[in-house]
A protein has these predicted regions:
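Extended beta-solenoid/beta-helix repeat architectures
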Residues: 1-241
Length: 241
């Protein structure tokens, strides 16, 4: 049975269901859960339920009152999902607020607030974030523009730096707001294989090869192979195991 497509231009409302393509331009609302091969929105888009899509692309203001499950997602603007987010590949540029995130490749450039863990193969965060759980991935890359917080960081390779990795907009905005260059990450623990950290405040850091760079304040470092500590960092205790 062929799936039909729906389109809203201007202001409108459609019922949830299973579709081929959903396209909303303007102010649109979907009442109930929706599943589509392709979901595109530009403007103010609200889903009163959960959304499952193959390709997901929105710009403007998007809100889902349930969960979000996509294969490939691109978001620009305001992004709010009440439930969990699952994606093979997800790129967000703007302000995002959601439940736990799980996926393959996750990139957020802007401001992120996640109620739960972020678990993926690769996580790249640029800007400022607050993650109530842990950030866990094979590769974690963080570029801090402002004060950020997570419970724990875990991964094979973890790198934390100040500054913007994915363009100059956040850097320009940070300078205008007076927060540029003040990025710092607060966590309880960092654990991985190769760790390269700057401007991290942590109770404990555990790794095989560890670099504690400028701006770090760490209570205890446990390392297996090598440890490098910057003179501009503070470490309470160093333990080789």
């Amino acid at each position: 049975m062929d799936r039909k497509s729906i389109s809203i231009a201007g202001s409108g409302k459609v019922e949830g269901g299973v579709y081929d393509r959903v396209k909303i331009s303007g102010s649109g609302k979907v009442t109930g859960d929706v599943e589509a091969e392709e979901f595109k929105g530009a403007g103010a888009v609200t889903v009163e339920g959960s959304l499952k899509a193959g390709k997901f692309e929105v710009s403007g203001a998007f809100k889902a009152e349930g969960a979000l499950e996509v294969e490939e997602g691109e978001v620009s603007g305001s992004f709010k999902v009440e439930g969990p987010v699952s994606a093979q590949e997800l790129r967000i540029s703007g302000a995002a607020k959601c439940g736990p995130i799980q996926g393959g490749y996750i990139r957020v450039s802007g401001a992120l607030k996640a109620k739960g863990d972020i678990e993926a193969d690769t996580v790249r965060l640029s800007g400022a974030f607050k993650v109530e759980g842990l950030i866990s991935a094979d590769r974690v890359e963080i570029h801090l523009e402002d004060r950020s917080k997570a419970r724990e960081l875990g991964g094979e390779t973890i790198q934390v730096r100040r500054g913007t990795a994915f363009g100059g907009l956040l850097s320009t905005l940070g300078r205008l707001l007076g927060t540029h260059g003040r990025g710092i990450l607060e966590v309880e623990a960092v654990e991985g294989d190769e760790l390269d950290l700057e401007w991290v405040v942590a109770e404990v850091v555990r790794g095989r090869v560890v670099r504690i760079g400028p701006g770090c304040r760490v209570g205890r470092v446990e390392y297996h192979e090598s440890l490098e500590v910057s003179p501009e960092a503070e470490v309470g205790e160093e333990v080789k195991g």
